């Protein structure tokens, strides 16, 4: 009898201890990896039963967290998920369904959370503020990335070159550069790209689409970057200024002052400050001619050469700028020099022109020490020593030291006469 009383008192003490532990817990309680509602748990303990012998609606869902089970499988690709909601979102990739639509602009999304994030673009709300510097962000991911600037954290490390990144997208892009993959291919011309964004922009060369339109002057651009640059012409904004020389072309001039040329050609070993210059150089080596004239079938390596060729068929006589070869139909010189007022059709020409007003000669020949204001002058100077003639005529295989001489020579084949006498109308 005494043993029974002692056993009961011991059980009462255990239950009391359990109640003391759970009296401040929320309505759902997790014990040894299993979830119980608090009222059911209390009832169970009062009856001296083991809690984990009970069942409750919702326990199965929570227990997946502990078991790692993925019971929801996609019929299209076989991918498995823990939650039915994740499977539903995933299936929209296959179906293309975007049920969440923005009432402001009509843009649609697969997930409601993405719509909520997008809405901040219209409202301008920035809920997420950095405690270090006070900068605010629309999305928590933006704040997380920004904080790494202060902490110096670079969690994404590439093992092949030990380079580390604070952003997973930068890491992914860097990995693709190492692997040399070009998964995005355009079926029309066969050209392949590393990034889907580059493929989208390239498609617009073929379609002529220019979706980014300036509200100020109506000028249309193929990509948003062009529109941003165009807007700065109207606002006269120059957000990026070089501390060394005051030039607004910050990235390029930083590399010029540092002597850094990170873009190397694998064919000829030439190095460049800008990736765009490397691309132009690669076209010289390439045999492919992706740009084809629909009128006569003639193909060209550069889109610019195709545009110039089209003028022969159209009879159009637009304004062509000699320095960069770009064509404008308005003749408007949008880029003005603040020093002398001279106008230019393109920003790169204005940047080059600004060196005229400085005495600085950044480009030095390593062989003889002679310095030049322009990289093109140094290149031409170096060809005197090497006798290199990289510009080859595709029609008759004549070679030239300078691209301008090749362009002049091409007119013998095309019959183009861009220089017209205003007095008699004769063209040359």
UniProtKB/Swiss-Prot annotation:
InterPro entries: KRAB, Znf_C2H2_sf, Znf_C2H2_type. Keywords: DNA-binding, Metal-binding, Nucleus, Repeat, Transcription, Transcription regulation, Zinc, Zinc-finger. It is found in: Nucleus. It comes from the Eukaryota. PROSITE patterns: KRAB, ZINC_FINGER_C2H2_1, ZINC_FINGER_C2H2_2. GO terms for biological process: regulation of transcription by RNA polymerase II. SUPFAM superfamilies: beta-beta-alpha zinc fingers. A zinc finger (C2H2-type) spans 72-94, 100-122, 128-150, 156-178, 184-206, 212-234, 263-285, 291-313, 335-357, 363-385, 391-413. The keyword Nucleus applies. Residues 1-64 form the KRAB domain. GO terms for molecular function: DNA-binding transcription factor activity, RNA polymerase II-specific; RNA polymerase II cis-regulatory region sequence-specific DNA binding; zinc ion binding. The keyword S-adenosyl-L-methionine does not apply. GO terms for cellular component: nucleus. Gene3D superfamilies: Classic Zinc Finger. Belongs to the krueppel C2H2-type zinc-finger protein family. May be involved in transcriptional regulation. This is Putative zinc finger protein 355P. It comes from Homo sapiens (Human).
């Amino acid at each position: 009898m005494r043993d029974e009383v002692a056993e009961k008192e011991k059980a009462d003490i255990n239950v009391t201890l359990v109640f003391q532990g759970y009296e401040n817990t929320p309505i759902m309680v997790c014990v040894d990896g299993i979830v119980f509602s608090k009222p059911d748990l209390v009832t169970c303990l009062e009856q001296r039963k083991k809690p984990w012998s009970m069942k409750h609606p919702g326990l199965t869902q929570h227990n997946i967290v502990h078991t790692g089970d993925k019971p929801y499988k996609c019929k299209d690709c076989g991918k498995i998920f823990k939650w039915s909601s994740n499977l539903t979102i995933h299936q929209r990739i296959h179906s293309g369904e975007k049920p969440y639509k923005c009432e402001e602009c009509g843009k649609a999304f697969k997930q409601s959370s993405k719509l909520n994030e997008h809405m901040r673009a219209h409202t301008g709300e920035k809920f997420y503020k950095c405690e270090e510097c006070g900068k605010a962000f629309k999305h928590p991911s933006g704040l997380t990335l920004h904080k790494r600037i202060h902490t110096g954290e670079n969690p994404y490390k590439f093992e092949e070159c030990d380079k580390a990144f604070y952003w997973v997208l930068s890491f992914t892009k860097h990995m693709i550069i190492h692997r040399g993959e070009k998964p995005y291919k355009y079926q029309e011309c066969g050209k392949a790209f590393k990034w889907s964004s580059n493929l989208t922009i390239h498609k617009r060369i073929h379609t002529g689409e220019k979706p980014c339109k300036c509200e100020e002057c109506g000028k249309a651009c193929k990509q948003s970057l062009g529109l941003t640059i165009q807007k700065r012409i109207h606002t006269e904004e120059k957000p990026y200024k070089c501390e060394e020389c005051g030039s607004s072309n910050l990235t390029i001039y930083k590399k010029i002052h540092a002597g850094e040329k990170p873009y190397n050609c694998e064919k000829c070993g030439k190095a460049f400050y800008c990736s765009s210059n490397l691309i132009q150089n690669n076209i010289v080596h390439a045999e492919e001619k992706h740009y084809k004239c629909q009128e006569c079938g003639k193909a060209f390596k550069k889109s610019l050469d195709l545009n110039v060729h089209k003028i022969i068929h159209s009879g159009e006589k637009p304004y062509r700028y000699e320095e960069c070869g770009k064509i404008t139909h308005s003749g408007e010189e949008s880029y003005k020099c603040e020093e002398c007022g001279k106008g230019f059709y393109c920003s790169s020409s204005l940047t080059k022109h600004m060196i005229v007003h400085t005495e600085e000669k950044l480009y030095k020949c390593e062989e003889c020490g002679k310095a030049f204001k322009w990289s093109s002058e140094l290149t031409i100077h170096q060809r005197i020593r090497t006798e290199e003639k990289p510009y080859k005529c595709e029609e008759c295989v004549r070679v030239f030291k300078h691209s301008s001489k090749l362009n002049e020579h091409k007119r013998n084949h095309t019959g183009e006469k861009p220089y017209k006498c205003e007095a008699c109308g004769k063209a040359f």
